[in-house]
Amino acid sequence: MTQNTPFPIFPHRHLLGIKGLTLQDLTTLLDRADANVTLYQKNDKKKSILHGRTQINLFFESSTRTQSSFELAGKRLGADVMNMIISNSSVKKGETLIDTATTLNAMNPDILVIRHNCAGAASLLAQKIDCCVINAGDGAHEHPTQALLDALTIRRTKGRIEGLTVAICGDILHSRVARSNIISLNTLGARVRVVAPSTLLPTGIEDMGVEVFHTMQEGLKGADVVMMLRLQLERMTGAFIPSIREYFYHFGLHKENLIYAKNDCIIMHPGPINRGVEIASDIADGTRSMIHTQVEMGIAVRMAIMEALLDPRHDYNGEKK
């Protein structure tokens, strides 16, 4: 895609999940994001494409990393960015999500970014508000922007995604990141594995097109990418693991089991990392770790999504301007 060639139109008003996106949809967003990385690596970080537009970040779950990334992405595009502080809002006083949506709609925003602890919250909001909605994570359902930044990290680091073996390891059961990544990586042509104890795997996970392994030794064999997930203890209501120490020994990533992956494999983690729980410090800080690269790619991806949703060629009435 050259600088003077327009990107294909992204044919969706909202980004509510990876499910339902085509290979062309994903490629369009990744190509846009790749162009953004190239620009700001040349210190050309600011654009004015969203000048005069309003972006509202509505986070019902705390996430310094994701919220800061969306805020910086909006500002780099020239948008006016407002962060809603939920602890000080009417929601804490009993206002429903629909009431909040109605109130925000009256402010005439152009983009609303929502993170919520309930699956489907972003979809509900999209039905009640006139602007574009971006899902920044809804319960254990989906986290589409994380999957896109992970795909961009892999593509820029390895040169491709198609044909690579990606091992996603850890708490698959409670992870929206795992769900979105499985869908996106399968669509992009990767071979996806999940590695976890049976207690941390959802029923029917095989139906998502993944190979299932219950030991790191088997699951990491020949892996090009190893993606670790944290234990989401806040979503657990029972005894899913015997102990943290035993979990780390069997399912954490450390030098004793990393030897089974390819020598040039890359290590990824959506953050925040729990050192000594799902990953050893020397691995997280090692030369194969892409954790900080993922953060960098996140800004470029979120810029690309907002650019695509507010592309002036859209009219959202089935025609293109």
UniProtKB/Swiss-Prot annotation:
Its EC number is 2.1.3.2. InterPro entries: Asp/Orn_carbamoyltranf_P-bd, Asp/Orn_carbamoylTrfase, Asp/Orn_carbamoylTrfase_sf, Asp_carbamoyltransf, Asp_carbamoyltransf_Asp/Orn-bd. NCBIfam families: asp_carb_tr, PRK00856.1. HAMAP family: Asp_carb_tr. Belongs to the aspartate/ornithine carbamoyltransferase superfamily. ATCase family. Keywords: Pyrimidine biosynthesis, Transferase. GO terms for biological process: 'de novo' pyrimidine nucleobase biosynthetic process; 'de novo' UMP biosynthetic process; amino acid metabolic process. Heterododecamer (2C3:3R2) of six catalytic PyrB chains organized as two trimers (C3), and six regulatory PyrI chains organized as three dimers (R2). The gene is pyrB. GO terms for molecular function: amino acid binding; aspartate carbamoyltransferase activity. L-aspartate binds at K93, R176, R230. It is an enzyme of class 2 (transferase). Carbamoyl phosphate binds at R65, T66, R115, H143, Q146, G271, P272. This is Aspartate carbamoyltransferase catalytic subunit. It catalyses: carbamoyl phosphate + L-aspartate = N-carbamoyl-L-aspartate + phosphate + H(+). Catalyzes the condensation of carbamoyl phosphate and aspartate to form carbamoyl aspartate and inorganic phosphate, the committed step in the de novo pyrimidine nucleotide biosynthesis pathway. GO terms for cellular component: cytosol. Pathway: Pyrimidine metabolism; UMP biosynthesis via de novo pathway; (S)-dihydroorotate from bicarbonate: step 2/3. PANTHER family: ASPARTATE CARBAMOYLTRANSFERASE, ORNITHINE CARBAMOYLTRANSFERASE, MITOCHONDRIAL. It comes from the Bacteria. It comes from Bartonella bacilliformis (strain ATCC 35685 / KC583 / Herrer 020/F12,63).
